[in-house]
Amino acid sequence: MQKLKVFLSDSLNPHLNLATEEWIFHNLDPSQQVLFLWRNEETVVIGRNQNPWSECNLAKMKDEKVHLARRTTGGGAVFHDLQNTNFTFLSPKESYKRENNVQIIFDALKTFGIQGEASGRNDLLIPFPDGPRKFSGSAYREKKDRAFHHGTLLLNTDLTRLGNYLTPNPKKLQAKGKESVRARVANLTEVSPGINHDQIVTTMVKSFENFYAGKAEVESLTMESLKLIPELKEQYEQLSSWEWLYGNTLEFSHKMDEYLTLGFFDFHFKVEDGQIKDLKIYTDCLYPQVIEDLTESLRGKAYRGDAVREALMSVRGKHTELNLGLSEVEEWLCKNIEI
């Protein structure tokens, strides 16, 4: 009989929960079957190879204090909040079958009268009169002796907000990569009103034990206990760093324009790995040297607010008589970059 292990996270910190996944994947005994259940505060989670500027409405996220997190697995951008339960399965590679995990989820949902169906490799659907709608998406990862499968279960997420955070301003961005396809989604409460995270956790653990015909060792993980694990602390620091969240981005272009005190400004940035690789400023500003200094000071800088402020500070130092107008340019740029 295989050993069964269940981890339940009491933390709502997205970077810590994703770091816990990494710790489970790299450090636990791969011969056991593991289930990790967790949820996050309001967070947009993007895939390993996605562009946050292209996938997310960063301005709205900043205003409403929504976290950004990046997975180590592929797939598209998703929105997490406390009405969204996340699952992670770890299995020995030789016995791993995605269908097993899907069956565990479906068996748990039957408790609430919900009949799910699988679609393709990643999505789980529930039928509606106007067609099936997605309530879960997932991603996968493996190495020589273990396989990893994680995903989301939409319980009662505010789907309007989800659309807002995952809808970029199309006027501002032209990314080289393909943007995520927004599938039609549904909450499980639309089929089973009143379903909540604690109920899902209870039924998922029971379904996990029933499927493998055993009793699982259940362990609750808190923020305090997780921080005591050195490997986990290292993973947390990496997954919450600017370099991981924003620097791990392929080349893309970002255009912004506005009428300001010093004239009309039309900035074209070329960004790669979170750095300003090149830029061009089109403007009717009457101070050409200021434009040259702006261009040179911004080129090569990190594409984030503090780096832009540092660059503009040096330009303002050279052109003190234009300090007010340059401060306006600075605030406008930082608002558009929004990190």
Curated annotation (Swiss-Prot):
First-listed, main subcellular location of the protein, grouped into a coarse class: cytoplasm
GO molecular function: ATP binding; lipoate-protein ligase activity; lipoyltransferase activity
Alphabetized UniProt keyword annotations: ATP-binding, Cytoplasm, Ligase, Nucleotide-binding
Family annotation (SUPFAM superfamilies): Class II aaRS and biotin synthetases (SSF55681), SufE/NifU (SSF82649)
EC number per UniProt: 6.3.1.20
Keyword Metal-binding: no
Stated name of the protein: Lipoate-protein ligase A
Species, as recorded: Bdellovibrio bacteriovorus (strain ATCC 15356 / DSM 50701 / NCIMB 9529 / HD100)
Gene from which the chain derives: lplA
